[in-house]
Amino acid sequence: MNMAFYGRWFACLWLATSCVQTASTDNKALEIIRRADEIRSPNKPFRYTLTVTEYKAGATQPENKQILDISMRFMKPQGNEKADARSLVRFIFPPRDKGKIMLSDWYDLWFYTPELRRPMPISRQQRLIGQISNGDVIVTNFEYAYDSTLMGEVSCAEKQCYKLALVRKSADITWPKVIYYVEKDGDNRPWKAAYYSQDDQLIKEVLYQDFQPVLGKTRPMKITVTDVRHGNNYSVMEYSDVRLESLPEFHFTKEYIQRGAK
């Protein structure tokens, strides 16, 4: 056998080994993302109250506040049940916003107010309040929305985290790229997510906080969103009254919200 043969043989062996390692890494990344998703939201229809407050950098008192009543119909496929991802967002506070409703069906989003004749499509990236966009108040399933790659391990506060790179699977997804930090030990609790634009500019950072036992798992009941582009102003999303609730499917339709969802 000549040297050229050995060269080709080692090249093939290296390529095969690399492919196996990459597949193994991606499978591990997928499992981490899946476990973290289970912490962020249950795989059953549920309802919660979301209080959003807006702060200037360094401030301790909010300058703006909004309260939303949200029903989520998110389910991964199990047995004869198909996957579903819909939500109903009712505006509660301030009083001037009562009667306004947002409806999402996978990655489509509509807004309705009694002044409109019919629901109108809106962007998930459109600002709702402070650093919070329309899409932020609706739980995103990272496993379905992004391809994930495990980049390694890093320190996060006093703990060790997996660092994962997420790249959106479709242009329908709000954020093209996310760097996601998930605790290595325990249930793989989410720690932080950094959201990037198409040209790799860091837009905002999300910190998961105040973990409490809710619906069978320890879940983050507070999320702080910091706008790194505009002086580190930040907004806080606080979750309360989280409970399982399965509304009829027709509640998650444009026809229903036009009649005034309850």
Where are these predicted regions, by residue range?
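Extended lipid/amphipathic-ligand handling interfaces
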Residues: 36-37, 69-78, 208-213
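N-terminal, post-signal-peptide region of Sec/Tat-exported proteins
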Residues: 48-82
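Flexible, processing/modification-adjacent segments and terminal tails
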Residues: 23-45, 51-52, 60-64, 95-176, ...
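Functional cores of ribonucleases/endoribonucleases
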Residues: 70-103
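Sec-dependent signal peptide recognition
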Residues: 2-12
